[in-house]
Amino acid sequence: MKLKKIFAAAFAFCAMFAVTAVMPQTAGAEPYTYTNKEEGYSIMCPTKPLGVLPASVLNEDEKGSVLVFANDGYKINKAWIIIPDGFDKGDLPDLTKLSQKDEALLLTQLKENSAYAVVDIIPITAKTKGVFAVTAKTIMVDTDGDGELDTEATADTQMAVVFLRSEKGRAFKIELIDNPEITAKNVSEFRAGISTLKDL
């Protein structure tokens, strides 16, 4: 059954880019509201996606959607990955209910115990907050399997990610793919889009 799902996802990926594989593609310039009735949310995008793929195309264990805005052949250059129920609520408290002191303490803990290069707690809407993070460009890895991080490696890409609770309390993980480098413009659009996330 798992192989069937993987083959189906791969077919969807190939079919979506079958026409666009030769030339680099970028989505149109008009804002667009993406609605996912099955997952129960909508979000405003800076442009209409070229296509939408299942998140399992990139990670077979994740259930969600990949909104692709730009690609070069089969390489995704810009996309949002939206994962409803994307984290355990027990791992992240309701940020709107924390005192300033507890929020600062949580932020310190997140910075000390995560592999992200940037971590911050940001307002999403007037009623919600989220954790914004950017993956590290250089990371330490265990090359000999002894459990010790011994070698510095350079990641091919960086990603931005936001963990948030919607106004109905759903746990969303939303990621930005931005190749070859993360840009301020795309991060700004990403954060603006996240602020429009609505439960259906």
For each of these PLM feature ranges, what is it?
Residues 1-5:
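Positively charged n-region of N-terminal signal peptides that target proteins for export
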Residues 16-26:
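C-terminal segment of classical bacterial N-terminal signal peptides
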Residues 49-51, 167-200:
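Surface-exposed amphipathic alpha-helical segments
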Residues 7-15:
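Sec-dependent signal peptide hydrophobic core
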Residues 24-46:
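Short N-terminal segments immediately surrounding and downstream of signal-peptide cleavage
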Residues 40, 97-100, 181-188:
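Soluble non-cytosolic domains of exported or imported proteins
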Residues 101-165:
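Signature of long, low-cysteine stretches enriched in small and polar/charged residues
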Residues 42-104:
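Secretory pathway targeting signatures of secreted, lumenal, and periplasmic proteins
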